[in-house]
């Protein structure tokens, strides 16, 4: 009898321990009711574990989406560890996801985890990529999914997930890193795009610098926002004179993708997206609107929709190894 009881208890406990590796946020009432968004974090510098947690809470509490946030987890401690590049538990959630939001950097995931991402992409479901997702993966040559690596040159998917799905891979810092912040300027002819409802020049701002992208972007990309390089780290600082803003680099665009002949899916990419970038309401609105658009819900985008932060949000400054130590996903509820 005691043995049976012990077995039953252990069976009951397994799902609880597994679920502790990610965060689930149930949607309230709202246009997104019934839609499932999976947000995949995991970068060493820009605090995607903070940014995507807050974005998920906004999408759930303000807009009704059911959200699951996945993290880089140290398997020895169960703690969020962005420096652990080979473990993001819970990617099975992508099997039933309507949207993937991704903000990873140079991940070396095992084949079993990459298969979940590959299956999702082959289904043609939508993708929203933030900041370092342009160089989301750095997989070893022996990986079955090496073709998703940011710098691989094989004909199968040259420059990997970044270039082939999002529209660009890692190139360089265009603004001076940690010295020149970014102001968002609506691209010429883009003001009528539904993602930009409620967004004007200067509403989007972040302390992260503009990334270099190669111009023109690949065929089919529609630039929505340009990044004005500023002389300092405050929203009101003037723009840098000269070549850095002539022309300005795209920092947000849309496109469609298809993986190896599969169905086409919608993509929104922004090279912004650190947790500190989300301090600006315009940046939060850009991301929320992009999720609606990616899901084909652009008719539900309201210029005055609620993008207020949920709970306490004190983003950490971006820097390598700057994550808050000792935090487990359950601590973020």
Please annotate each region the language model reported:
Residues 126, 133, 229, 273-275:
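Catalytic metal-binding/acid-base residues of hydrolase active sites
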Residues 35, 49-53, 87-88, 95, ...:
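A structural signal for well-ordered alpha-helical segments within the folded catalytic domains
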Residues 107-198:
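A glycine-rich, often tryptophan-bearing local segment used as a flexible ligand/cofactor-contacting loop or short
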Residues 20-29, 38-40, 44-137:
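Helical hinge/lid and interdomain linker segments adjacent to catalytic or ligand-binding clefts
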Residues 4-15:
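Bacterial N-terminal signal peptides
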Residues 38, 68, 128, 222-226, ...:
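Hydrophobic/aromatic beta-strand patches that form the interior of the parallel beta-sheet core
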Residues 22, 60, 66, 84-85, ...:
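Catalytic beta-strand/loop cores that center a nucleophilic Ser/Cys/Thr
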Residues 19-35, 50-51, 58-62, 231-333:
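Extracellular ligand-binding/catalytic regions of CAZymes and related secreted enzymes
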């Amino acid at each position: 009898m005691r043995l049976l009881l012990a077995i039953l208890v252990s069976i009951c406990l397994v799902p609880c321990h597994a679920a502790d590796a990610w965060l689930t946020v149930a949607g309230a009432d709202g246009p997104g009711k019934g839609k499932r968004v999976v947000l995949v974090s995991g970068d060493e510098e820009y605090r995607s574990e903070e940014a995507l947690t807050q974005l998920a809470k906004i999408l759930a509490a303000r807009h009704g989406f059911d959200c699951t946030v996945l993290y880089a987890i140290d398997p020895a401690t169960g703690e969020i560890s962005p420096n652990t590049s080979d473990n993001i538990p819970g990617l099975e959630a992508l099997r039933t996801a309507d949207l993937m939001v991704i903000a990873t950097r140079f991940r070396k995931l095992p084949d079993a985890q990459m298969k979940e991402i590959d299956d999702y992409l082959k289904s043609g479901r939508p993708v929203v990529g933030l900041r370092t997702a342009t160089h989301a993966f750095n997989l070893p040559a022996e990986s079955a999914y090496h073709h998703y690596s940011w710098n691989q040159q094989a004909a199968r998917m040259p420059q990997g997930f970044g270039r082939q799905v999002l529209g660009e891979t890692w190139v360089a810092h265009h603004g001076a890193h940690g010295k020149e912040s970014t102001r968002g300027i609506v691209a010429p002819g883009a003001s009528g795009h539904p993602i930009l409802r409620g967004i004007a020049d200067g509403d989007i701002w972040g302390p992260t610098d503009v990334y270099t992208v190669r111009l023109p972007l690949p065929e089919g990309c529609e630039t929505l926002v340009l990044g004005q390089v500023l002389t300092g780290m405050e929203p009101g600082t003037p723009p840098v004179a000269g070549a850095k803003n002539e022309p300005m680099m795209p920092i947000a665009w849309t496109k469609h993708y298809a993986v190896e002949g599969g169905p086409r899916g919608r993509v929104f990419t922004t090279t912004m997206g650190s947790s500190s970038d989300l301090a600006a309401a315009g940046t939060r609105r850009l991301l929320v609107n992009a999720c609606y658009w990616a899901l084909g819900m652009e008719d539900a985008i309201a210029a005055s929709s609620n993008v207020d932060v949920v709970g306490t949000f004190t983003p950490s400054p971006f820097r390598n190894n700057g994550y808050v130590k000792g935090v487990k996903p359950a601590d973020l509820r």
